[in-house]
């Protein structure tokens, strides 16, 4: 929890490692002067190289293995529209995950911000509105990737759920109504109404996104 000034000073005057940070910054950015902005850019570029692509799901897509029947059912539920079609036009009795966690770039995130129905009000946890000042951003938080989600408990932006079972139960319930709850949530129609075996299948699919070679 040191300040950026301390970080930059340590990088500029590092006498304890074999790395020549000023020279490395010169090679990357054309200057030996290390700044907070350039350090952030360097870290961000490194993080972008950290790509998980060897989960069971990836191997299945490459034809190297098979998903179990339960995992495949979970995948189909993941891709289907939620809700009873008699109540929700277009409903397919699915898990409705794809809207926010579709396969965009196969990172399983739309990289957007959503209110996923955790709380009825946001006085103590405002969300994106703290950044934008736009009232309709109240209670909105960024969609995380689902890769290695089985290894990343606790869940939600505030860590309120300790297991994937709790997460699935939350979405199955439809969430808590609020002024900015996402239209993809099924709070007005009693939730997704997934059966126990369907919830188990969805969780099995989420486990198939685990890539231990990446950890």
Where are these regions (language model features)?
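Post-cleavage N-terminal segment of exported redox proteins
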Residues: 2-84, 102-107, 187-191, 197-215
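Short glycine/threonine-rich turn/loop motifs
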Residues: 55-170, 175-182
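Phosphate-binding glycine-rich loops and adjacent basic patches that engage nucleotide phosphates
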Residues: 1-8, 32-44, 125-134, 160-169
């Amino acid at each position: 929890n040191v300040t950026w000034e301390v970080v930059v000073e340590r990088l500029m005057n590092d006498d304890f490692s074999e790395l020549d940070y000023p020279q490395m910054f010169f090679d990357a950015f054309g200057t030996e002067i290390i700044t907070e902005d350039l350090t952030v850019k360097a870290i961000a570029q490194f993080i972008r190289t950290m790509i998980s692509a060897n989960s069971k799901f990836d191997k299945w897509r490459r034809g190297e293995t098979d998903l179990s029947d339960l995992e495949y059912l979970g995948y189909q539920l993941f891709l289907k529209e939620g809700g009873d079609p008699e109540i929700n036009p277009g409903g397919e009795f699915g898990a409705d995950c794809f809207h926010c966690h579709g396969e965009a770039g196969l990172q399983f995130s739309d990289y957007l911000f959503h209110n996923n129905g955790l709380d009825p009000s946001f006085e103590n946890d405002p969300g994106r509105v703290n950044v934008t000042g736009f009232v309709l951003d109240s209670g909105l938080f960024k969609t995380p990737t689902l890769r290695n989600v089985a290894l990343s408990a606790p869940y939600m932006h505030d860590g309120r759920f300790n297991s994937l079972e709790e997460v699935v139960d939350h979405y199955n319930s439809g969430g808590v109504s609020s002024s900015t709850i996402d239209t993809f949530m099924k709070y007005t129609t009693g939730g997704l109404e997934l059966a126990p075996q369907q919830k188990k299948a969805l969780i099995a699919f989420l486990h198939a996104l685990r890539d231990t070679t990446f950890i």
